Amino acid sequence: MRKLRQNSLMTSATTPALGVIGVPKEIKGDERRVALTPDGAAELVQMGCQVLIEHDAGRGSGFSDEMYVSSGAQIVATAKEAWSAELVLKVKEPQAGEFDFLRPDLTLFTYLHLAAYPKVATALKHSGCTAFAYETVTDRNGVLPLLAPM
């Protein structure tokens, strides 16, 4: 994650300029990854964000709830609470059980693969949310860094 200048992001001592970020547990079969590590959560908290992590969202990737709490994130009990954030970070495209969480004031960052999942495209369109597909993010050279092998 690129470091942003903190003083340009804060609007006041009590109001985070970047708002609330939610990380729900992935529900797609066999998906164990999580969209945000505890270190990433700590960086966002330091920039003034409130970070909501659904209980056990990081467990499949080896991150405990306690690790997120130590980073300054808050653990929430339900997906609904994580999805209530202004910005939601996920790994996989929204599943049918998550479509009701999509709404006009939501920004979603995740892999979308819309050509393979037309029902997701339809749900996103009808919800009015703003969605960014990781697989389409390019750098200055036109390279797709989020598709590079880890």
What residue ranges belong to the model's regions?
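Short, well-ordered coil/turn residues at beta-beta hairpins
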Residues: 90-91, 111
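Short acidic low-complexity segments
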Residues: 72-84
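Glycine- and acidic-residue-enriched helix-capping/strand-helix junction motifs
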Residues: 29-38
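Glycine/serine-rich phosphate-binding loop and adjoining beta1-alpha1 elements at the start
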Residues: 2-20, 26, 96-150
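Short internal beta-strands
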Residues: 22, 41, 45-60
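N-terminal beta-loop-helix "entrance" segment that forms/cooperates
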Residues: 52-74
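Short phosphate-binding/catalytic loops that engage adenosine nucleotides
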Residues: 49, 73, 129
